[in-house]
Amino acid sequence: MKSKFNWKEVIRPTATLTIICLLVTAALAVTNSVTQGPIAALATQKELASRQQVLPQAASFEEIPDTGETTSPCKALDSAGNVVGYVIVTSANGYGGSVKVMTGIQTDGTVAGITILEQSETVGLGANCEKESFRNQFLQTVPDNGFSVYKAGQNAPENGGIEALTSATITSNAVVKAVNRATEIFATLTKGGN
């Protein structure tokens, strides 16, 4: 006996599924277009707040174009328009991925503050890099050889020593590398007269 192929049994579910997929795609496109602006505005607001956190004496910030860096460093200006420092975003590889750090450096070469913008380190270990007690270790004049990590119980370097987070030396090294990269960019910017 020959079985008959019924086109209605195939076309109807296929058409229904296609219509559902088109409606869902349209809904996602509308949602994306509606939320894209507010999300961008929130990101800009968060970045400005982070800049203010790492260089609180600044009244405004001005991006420095064409530095060859992946993120544009910013001049920090006081209310009179004088440069009081620079805000530089850098990153380095940590244990759980990239650690993105924003560093504020005053014109005299003193780190005014750092904040961790992004990290995916282990909770309770490497994620402690966001704690103020760790970040405050960087609040000093940038040493000639940059910052370096030492473990608790070891002799701290004379200057520029950053005590590693307990059981998170890789993360500690990542933050130090990112801050050291920011200090290198700072040195380049200040030599160039920016």
Q: What do the predicted segments below correspond to?
A:
Residues 2-194:
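Flexible, solvent-exposed loop/hinge segments and secondary-structure transition points
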